[in-house]
C-alpha cells in the first residue's frame, strides 16, 4: 500500500480502515481545519487569559509597593479565582461547540466551522455551562485550600482535581456530544470509563493541562504568547486524538451492544470483521 492510498483524501469517498489512519488523514488533509478549531478555542480562552494577566500585573504592582504584600497577594489570588468562574463559564460554553466539531471529525463527517460549532452549542451548552460553573467553584475552593493550609497538604485538593475531576470531564465532554443523557448519567458513565482506561486517560489529561506549567514562566508576555500558540496549534491535535480514543472506548464498552448504528462510525469495517464481532 503506497502512501497516497494509506492517507486518503477526505473527498475520495473511502473511509479509513481504523482511527489511527483517520487521525493521520485529518492531520494531512484537514490541518487548517484543526487550526481553525484552535483559533476558536483561543477566542473562548481569552477571558481567562485576561484574568490571569490582570493577576500578574496587579501582583507586580503590589510587590513593588512594599506594604502588607503577603495579605494583598492572598486577596488578589482569591479575587482572581472568583473572576475566573465567569471565565470558565465562557470557556465551557465555547467548548460545547468545539467538541461537536471534533466528534464530526472523528466520524469523518466534518462540517463548516461556524455552523457546526453553533449546532454543538445549541445541543450541549446547558450541560457544558453547568460544568463550567462547577469547575470555577472548585478552582476557588482549591485556591482557598492553598491559602489556608500549609505544607504538602495544601496541594492535595489541586492534585485530586487533576487526577479525578479533569479526566472525568474529558469523558463527559465526549459523552455529551454523542448521547442524549441526563447530567448525572453522563458523569457516572464518564467516571466508569475513566477507571476502565485509567493510564491512557491520565496521559491525555496531562497533555491537556500541560499549558498550566507556563504559569511558572517569569515573563508573562512570553508566557501568554507560548500559551496562545499551544492552544491554536497543539491543543486541537491533542483533543482530536482524545476524541478518537474516547469514541473507540465508547464503541468497545457501549456502542457495540447498545448503539450499533454508530459502532465503528467513521471507519471502514469489512463484512468479515463485522461478522466476527457479532459472533464474539
Predicted regions and their residues:
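Helix-coil boundary and N-terminal low-complexity module in membrane systems
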Residues: 1-143, 147, 151-155, 168-170, ...
Amino acid at each position: 500500500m503506497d502512501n497516497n492510498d494509506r492517507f486518503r483524501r477526505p473527498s475520495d469517498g473511502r473511509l479509513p480502515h481504523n482511527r489511527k489512519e483517520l487521525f493521520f488523514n485529518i492531520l494531512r488533509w484537514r490541518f487548517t481545519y484543526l487550526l481553525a478549531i484552535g483559533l476558536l478555542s483561543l477566542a473562548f480562552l481569552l477571558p481567562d487569559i485576561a484574568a490571569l494577566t490582570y493577576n500578574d500585573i496587579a501582583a507586580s504592582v503590589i510587590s513593588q509597593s512594599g506594604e502588607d504584600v503577603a495579605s494583598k497577594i492572598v486577596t488578589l489570588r482569591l479575587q482572581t479565582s472568583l473572576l475566573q468562574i465567569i471565565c470558565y463559564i465562557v470557556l465551557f460554553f465555547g467548548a460545547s461547540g468545539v467538541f461537536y466539531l471534533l466528534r464530526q471529525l472523528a466520524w469523518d463527517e466534518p462540517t463548516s466551522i461556524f455552523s457546526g460549532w453553533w449546532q454543538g452549542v445549541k445541543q450541549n451548552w446547558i450541560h457544558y455551562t453547568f460544568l463550567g460553573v462547577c469547575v470555577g467553584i472548585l478552582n476557588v475552593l482549591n485556591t482557598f485550600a492553598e491559602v489556608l493550609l500549609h505544607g504538602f497538604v495544601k496541594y492535595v485538593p489541586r492534585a485530586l482535581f487533576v487526577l479525578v475531576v479533569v479526566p472525568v470531564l474529558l469523558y463527559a465532554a465526549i459523552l455529551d456530544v454523542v448521547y442524549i443523557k441526563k447530567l448525572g448519567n453522563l458523569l457516572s458513565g464518564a467516571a466508569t470509563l475513566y477507571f476502565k482506561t485509567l493510564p491512557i486517560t491520565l496521559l491525555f489529561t496531562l497533555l491537556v493541562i500541560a499549558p498550566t506549567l507556563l504559569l511558572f514562566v517569569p515573563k508573562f508576555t512570553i508566557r501568554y504568547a507560548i500559551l496562545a500558540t499551544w492552544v491554536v496549534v497543539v491543543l486541537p491535535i491533542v483533543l482530536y486524538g482524545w476524541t478518537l480514543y474516547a469514541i473507540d472506548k465508547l464503541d468497545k464498552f457501549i456502542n457495540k451492544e447498545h448503539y450499533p448504528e454508530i459502532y465503528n462510525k467513521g471507519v471502514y469495517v469489512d463484512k468479515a470483521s463485522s461478522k466476527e464481532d457479532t459472533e464474539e
